């Protein structure tokens, strides 16, 4: 199995990317990695390894670049060349922590969309209190959506939940402003009815406040709402940890308490750490495309690679294509 990795994407590239890659090839003997980026900058951090190859890229798509223009004009960028490795069959999946919009553009126009998929979806796995996590899609690939798109999101999410998260018959929830059947705007109401008509394990509407309690294994929504929900969860988690840090260092007694609680606090932080779950998958493409968080460290990159490897080994793209075709034939 070969995975192409954008060595220049993210705030901590290429050092953090290479750290993640090195750990991945150590842990997974079936894995080969193609690192794409500035050869000299990569060489400064890379220890030679038989299953890691380097492909030089003269350009980098920056976080501030306009996505579509950047993909069209920077043909020799690390991200575009990475997507090309997949499109041309030299890699089974690809990963970048770079410009999200550019990665979605490269995924859509270079890797290509599965036949029958109307709109791809960006889908991260978020933490839950139990530690199992849940899939949220879409979180920004498409800010406007139709009910039919959300039904496809649910199908793709169900496949991922079963094949990668290991959940039998995943519970599908629709993000809404209330749990009652007739709640929400027109999109939510129509989507609710369409999901009820599928053979998915649709449990009905779920509210944002219940997401982290693990009420559903997969939660679907439009990209605008999903992105707001994602950023709210991220911001709230960061604020809570800042408050804890301030409180537990505010006095000598507090510091003593913090020392006693340190193992449990570390356990809680690990459980709520997004990087443990990998990156956000761009679902609906012909091969796995993973968006790692822009601030990813080596550990986060490692988990994104682990996620991509699992998606390839479980034939997630092929299963999605099969389920979408079955739905179209109904």
From Swiss-Prot:
Substrates-to-products reaction catalysed: a fatty acyl-[ACP] + phosphate = an acyl phosphate + holo-[ACP]
Cellular component terms (Gene Ontology): cytoplasm
Pathway: Lipid metabolism; phospholipid metabolism
Subcellular locations according to the entry: Cytoplasm
GO BP term (any one): phospholipid biosynthetic process
NCBIfam families xref list: plsX
Description of how the protein assembles with itself and partners: Homodimer. Probably interacts with PlsY.
Name of the molecule in the record: Phosphate acyltransferase
């Amino acid at each position: 199995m070969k995975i192409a990795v954008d060595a220049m994407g993210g705030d901590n590239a290429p050092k953090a990317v290479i750290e993640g890659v090195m750990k991945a090839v150590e842990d997974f003997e079936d894995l080969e990695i193609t690192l794409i980026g500035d050869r000299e900058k990569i060489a400064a951090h890379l220890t030679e390894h038989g299953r890691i190859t380097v492909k030089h890229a003269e350009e980098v798509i920056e976080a501030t670049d306009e996505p579509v223009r950047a993909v069209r004009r920077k043909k020799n960028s690390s991200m575009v060349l990475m997507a090309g490795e997949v499109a041309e069959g030299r890699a089974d999946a690809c990963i970048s922590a770079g410009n999200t919009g550019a990665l979605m553009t490269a995924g859509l126009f270079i890797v290509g969309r599965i036949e029958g998929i109307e709109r791809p979806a960006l889908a991260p796995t978020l933490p839950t209190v139990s530690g199992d996590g849940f899939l949220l899609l879409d979180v920004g690939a498409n800010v406007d959506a139709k009910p039919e798109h959300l039904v496809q999101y649910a199908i793709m999410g169900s496949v991922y939940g079963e094949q990668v998260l290991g959940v039998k018959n995943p519970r599908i929830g629709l993000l809404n402003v209330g749990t009652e059947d007739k709640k929400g705007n027109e999109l939510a109401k129509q989507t609710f009815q369409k999901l009820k008509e599928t053979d998915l394990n649709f449990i009905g509407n779920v509210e944002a406040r219940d997401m982290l309690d693990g009420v559903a294994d997969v939660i679907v929504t439009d990209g605008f709402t999903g992105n707001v929900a994602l950023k709210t969860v991220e911001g709230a988690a960061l604020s809570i940890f800042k408050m804890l840090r301030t409180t537990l260092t505010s006095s000598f007694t507090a510091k003593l308490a913090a020392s006693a609680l340190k193992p449990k606090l570390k356990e809680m932080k690990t459980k709520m750490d997004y990087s443990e779950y990998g990156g956000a998958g761009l679902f609906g493409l012909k091969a796995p495309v993973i968006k790692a968080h822009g601030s990813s460290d080596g550990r986060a990159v490692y988990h994104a690679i682990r996620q991509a490897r699992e998606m390839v080994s479980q034939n997630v793209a092929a299963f999605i294509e099969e389920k979408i075709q079955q739905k179209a034939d109904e």
